[in-house]
């Protein structure tokens, strides 16, 4: 395994943890008790539903792209010569949080994965048990300060990027874009980065927003990178 951190600014500025979700959303009526009831208690009482589907992946021509929403923020992006996973998480439980919809396909039905994009270190997006089980050696691309969490998870290469920094390999390119969120996995690691990605390959540009609230940066991403497809798992939490 080789770990390739960002090549400039070895100490990116830290963003303090938000004091509440009010700092991440225009809503001014956030209530922690309501959030706990809706996201935890109500979920416990709700039967899990949805069905796994055995995928019939299409035959693609150069320039074609197939995108499968697995669930939550997880997507499978396929080209003729490249299989990409974004924020893969196949778990039915995440601590107290219950998954209400089964993942759209089973982990064992995935094709060999060439590239994994991880938008930030939160447990529902950077799910270590899932990452350990992914088929085939792979490249992992993630924001600054997250690479240490990826050690020992089977990645052949680990790439960390700063905002607006790009990494190219073969004939594909990925750029880390800003988002309105935060990156800490615990209360003591606010140095970790966060963002979204624009993936460019075979003339296509695909944008995954990460775990972002709405912000003016969407306009800047559109101006600078002009993605043609946007994957917006906003509100998935």
What are these regions (language model features)?
Residues 1-94, 98-109, 142-208, 228-235:
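Metallo-beta-lactamase
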Residues 54-55, 72, 101-106, 126-129, ...:
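A generic local structural motif
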Residues 93, 122-126, 147-149, 165-168, ...:
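Active-site environment of divalent metal-dependent phosphoester hydrolases
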Residues 129, 181-237:
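Active-site-proximal loop/helix segments of hydrolase catalytic cores
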């Amino acid at each position: 395994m080789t770990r390739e951190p960002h090549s400039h600014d070895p100490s990116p500025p830290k963003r303090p943890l938000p004091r509440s979700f009010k700092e991440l959303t225009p809503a001014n009526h956030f209530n922690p008790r309501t959030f706990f009831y809706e996201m935890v208690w109500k979920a416990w009482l709700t039967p899990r539903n949805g069905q796994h589907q055995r995928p019939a992946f299409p035959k693609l021509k150069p320039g074609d792209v197939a995108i499968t929403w697995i669930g939550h923020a997880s997507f499978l992006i396929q080209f003729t010569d490249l299989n990409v996973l974004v924020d893969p998480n196949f778990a039915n439980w995440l601590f107290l949080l219950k998954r209400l919809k089964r993942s759209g396909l089973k982990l064992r039905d995935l094709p060999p994965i060439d590239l994994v994009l991880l938008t930030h270190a939160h447990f529902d997006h950077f799910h270590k048990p899932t990452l350990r089980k992914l088929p085939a050696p792979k490249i992992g691309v993630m924001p600054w300060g997250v690479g240490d969490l990826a050690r020992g998870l089977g990645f052949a290469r680990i790439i960390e990027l700063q905002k607006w920094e790009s990494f190219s390999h073969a004939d594909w390119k990925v750029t880390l874009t800003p988002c309105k969120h935060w990156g800490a996995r615990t209360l003591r690691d606010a140095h970790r980065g966060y963002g979204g990605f624009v993936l460019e390959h075979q003339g296509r540009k695909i944008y995954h927003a990460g775990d972002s609230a709405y912000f003016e940066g969407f306009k800047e991403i559109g101006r600078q990178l002009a993605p043609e497809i946007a994957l917006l798992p906003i509100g998935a939490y």
